[in-house]
Amino acid sequence: MRNAKITRKTKETDIQMELELDGTGSSNIDTGIGFFDHMLTSFAKHGNLDLIIEATGDLIVDEHHLIEDTAIVLGQALSEALGDKDGIARFGDARIPMDEALADVVLDLGGRTYLVMKAEFEAPRVGEMNTQLVRHFFESLTDNSKMNLHIAVTGYNDHHKIEALFKAFAYALRRAVKIEGEGIKSTKGVL
């Protein structure tokens, strides 16, 4: 089983997460940030991941700490669930539309952390989520999963753009974690 159970408790947040890479897309997510919950639910569904997240935090301040720490824990869970990465495809990509929005995501689970993100948002918020935190979410996730991630999105509706990004990320990850045989896909012999 390729799964992980991670807990992170700080003075700012308390997060419990369970992740199953070879799941069915079921999820139970409660961060207290409705739009963020919607994005994570969509991520689980389209990534065919089973994902449980119970997260609380200092939302009275703002949503920054909770979104950042959720991304940290998700990155750690991905890394733990992948183990030594034996047999995984390693690379994944997806191009996903949502109405006028079009998201492109390409990733490499080879252990080199890097994020390139080309996305502009017009509105300061979508629901209860600050749009600046979309980039911060993916930065924190890549740092903690040791993933190289390239993201680009076009469109004019920020909800559609963000949702297309999360769906494209889910499909790209789904392809990258797929078992394609045996062995490590690296000339170094390790990922």
From Swiss-Prot:
GO CC terms, sorted: cytoplasm
EC class name: lyase
Catalytic activity: D-erythro-1-(imidazol-4-yl)glycerol 3-phosphate = 3-(imidazol-4-yl)-2-oxopropyl phosphate + H2O
Pfam family, one: IGPD
GO molecular function: imidazoleglycerol-phosphate dehydratase activity
EC number: 4.2.1.19
InterPro entries per record: IGPD_sf (IPR038494), ImidazoleglycerolP_deHydtase (IPR000807), ImidazoleglycerP_deHydtase_CS (IPR020565), Ribosomal_Su5_D2-typ_SF (IPR020568)
Top-level lineage group: Archaea
Keywords: Amino-acid biosynthesis, Cytoplasm, Histidine biosynthesis, Lyase
Keyword Cell wall biogenesis/degradation: no
Cross-referenced Gene3D superfamilies: Imidazole glycerol phosphate dehydratase, domain 1
Assigned protein family: Belongs to the imidazoleglycerol-phosphate dehydratase family.
UniProt protein name: Imidazoleglycerol-phosphate dehydratase
Species the sequence originates in: Methanococcoides burtonii (strain DSM 6242 / NBRC 107633 / OCM 468 / ACE-M)
Source species taxonomy: Archaea, Methanobacteriati, Methanobacteriota, Stenosarchaea group, Methanomicrobia
Gene name of this polypeptide: hisB
